[in-house]
């Protein structure tokens, strides 16, 4: 599901998570505002929030700690798949990596597998650039 970020989108994101959407795309240039909304949502739903970037790897928003050595996009997806418990994972600026067929395939596989879990994967990007192969998964 693709969402243009706006004030009311927190409820929409919560509905998608409750409905077990495993792969969500949010388009917004306001990273900080979106992540703060997601943090509040995760606190309310008692979920862990981990945010990934190519420069920092994963960090858990609640305590700032994380797996900083996971900077490769494929390893980031693998990290999400291996993680346990209820969690929301945010991939910042992931759209450039979707030019790689292996990354697209791995995301499709992840979307299918994550439906069986209590985890969701959210792509946060300033632009909407979804490969056709992923359109039905997002």
Residue ranges and their predicted role:
Residues 2-138:
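ATP/nucleotide-binding catalytic cores
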């Amino acid at each position: 599901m693709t969402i243009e970020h706006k004030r009311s989108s927190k409820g929409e994101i919560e509905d998608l998570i409750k409905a077990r959407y495993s792969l969500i795309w949010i388009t917004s240039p306001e990273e900080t505002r979106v992540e703060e909304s997601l943090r509040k949502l995760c606190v309310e739903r008692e979920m862990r929030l981990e945010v990934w970037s190519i420069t920092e790897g994963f960090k858990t928003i609640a305590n700032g700690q994380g797996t900083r050595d996971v900077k490769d996009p494929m390893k980031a997806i693998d990290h999400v798949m291996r993680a346990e418990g209820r969690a929301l994972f945010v991939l910042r600026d992931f759209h450039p990596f979707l030019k790689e067929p292996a990354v697209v395939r791995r995301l499709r596989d992840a979307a299918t597998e994550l439906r069986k879990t209590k985890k969701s994967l959210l792509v946060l990007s300033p632009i909407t650039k979804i490969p056709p192969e992923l359109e039905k998964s997002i």
